[in-house]
Amino acid sequence: MNWDEQMLWEGIDRMEKGIEVMCVSEYGKKFSVCGVESEVIDYSVSHPGPSEISRKTWEYARKKGHKVWAKIQLNNSWECSAVPFIPVFPLQAEHLNALSSLHIENYMLSWTLGGYPSPLLSLVNFCKGGKCDLEGWLKAECGEEAERIRAATEQFAAAFRNYPFSVEVLYK
């Protein structure tokens, strides 16, 4: 994006009140994997948002009377883009819970990668308007296999949180 905070605030100040403000939720989120410091440049499933700059932007936009949106990839991201969705449900629920705690109710979902109609679309609907009850969703979605799927996806999520994806390292 390459805009500093001052440029963001100035842009929002110049918008008419009917214009809605959308941020990539994870943009700029800082993280460390195996001692390598990095930050999210685009989207991330392994490092759930929102980032500090997205939080500040939504807060500023709301103060100025704008409706706000979170742009998120839930199914997958460039971290692992060749699959329809990544079954790391605890990370996806963590992201939705963080957005819910900020009263973010509007999303642009999985718009570029992983547009596959995965179970994650029902997770968003299940979590709308409150705390994301992952276990309740798994029971509704998976029936008697819910506990086994929960255990597996917790392991996947723990591993994926340590996935060494860094655009800065990748393209140097």
Locations of the language-model features?
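Substrate-binding groove of N-acetylhexosamine-processing glycoside hydrolases
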Residues: 1-172
